[in-house]
Structure formats: C-alpha cells, structure tokens
Amino acid sequence: MAIKKSELYSSLWASCDELRGGMDASQYKDYVLTMLFVKYISDKYKNDPFGAITVPQGATFDDMVALIGNPEIGDKINKEILNPIKEANKLNEFPDFNDETKLGKGKDLVDTVSNLVRIFNDDALDFSANSAEGDDILGDAYEYLMRHFATESGKSKGQFYTPAEVSRVLAKVIGISPKNATNQTTAYDLTCGSGSLLLKVANESGKDITLSGQEKETTTANLARMNMILHNSPTAEIVADNTLTRPAYKE
C-alpha cells in the first residue's frame, strides 16, 4: 500500500510544530529534513548491501527509536547514528541534535528530540512498504517543505529552493531532451542550492546523466546531497565551497 502524501505532510508539519518555539524556519528545516532522510534510508536500504546509500549497522531509525527518553539522546544521535551515516556516504555535516541553544537544556532537549523521533515512528510512514517504487513521494515532500520553509522564514525561496516551474522552464531553455541527451551528458549548477534545478534537468533529459553542483552553504549543500538521493540520483556530486573563490569545476 502506497503512503499517502497527506499523512506524510501531516507528520512533517507536526515535527515542525515541535521545534517551532526554539528557532526560526531557516534553522528547524534542517532537523525535520534530516529526520525524514534517516527514516527514509533506514526503511529503504537498511537490509540492502547494494542500495543507493549505506546504512551502517546501529545507525538506523530503529536505533533512534531505542534512544527515546535517554538523557543522552542528542549526543548519541550525533555520534552513533548521524556520524556513521555521514562517513559511510561522504555527506557533509548534519545539524547538531545536542545543541542546547536551539533544542533546550536538560530535560527540555530530551523531550523535544524524543518527540521528534516519535512523530516519525508511525506505521503510516513505513517507506519500505511503499508499493510505488518509482513514485517520487519523498522528493515531492522535500520540495513541498522547502517552499513552506521559505515562506515561514520570510526569506526568498531562491536562497535554497528554485520553484519547480522556474526549474522546468530553465531545463527546457537549455534544450536538453531524450533526443539529444546521452549517458555521457553532464549538467552542472554552480550555485545549486538544494539541487532542484539539477533534478529538473535530469528529468527533462530522460537519461542517466551526470549531475554536479557547488553550494557555498555547507548545510544547504548537504540538503542538496540528500535531495539527490531521495530523487534516485545518488551518484550526483555536490561540493560545499565558494564557487567564486574556489571553483570545483573549471572545465
């Protein structure tokens, strides 16, 4: 049975409400999307040695659930779950789940992080049971949240999200299509944000093209990398660095 988008969105916004008091949208988006990412890759790949992403033993969402109520839950999520996932998949830094300035101190932090895990510990959000293997429900949810986070934070969507309509038009403007794209075709975005434009170009190509991007903000670059994985483009290369002073791609 496929997961209903309404159920997924409801859970995501419940997690936003849990975090909303201590930080603004530009900050809590990282926690929500990280939790979504860990839940998704755990359900999809934890028992798949040939999966698109490696989920180390002891670093699954189930291991997060086992930490609910633990006085050291924030520190343990950082060290025992997120760090192993980061190292195994060459990701950038995840948000700090033990940050007292954002999540509260002592029992407040434990309760906030525990409740965040509980929200995603829902049978309705079992991604391993999603019958539509090719359905982009996670990618759609990711972009849905990006749009709303931009609105909530009062910042331009362009900071970390290119609207789907704009991405689609730009992908068509450059003229890429199944007729002229091959498996040797490459696409590069020098200010890729969350990677939405790259993904639209890949979609327009109709082929397994090579995707590359560079993004100055480390957190946003990590969101782009996660976005690539959620959209079945795990081989995309995203560099976190300043394009103007240290361009990673010069050819």
Q: Which residues make up each language-model segment?
A:
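Non-catalytic, mostly N-terminal accessory regions of nucleic-acid modification and defense proteins
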Residues: 1-178, 239-248
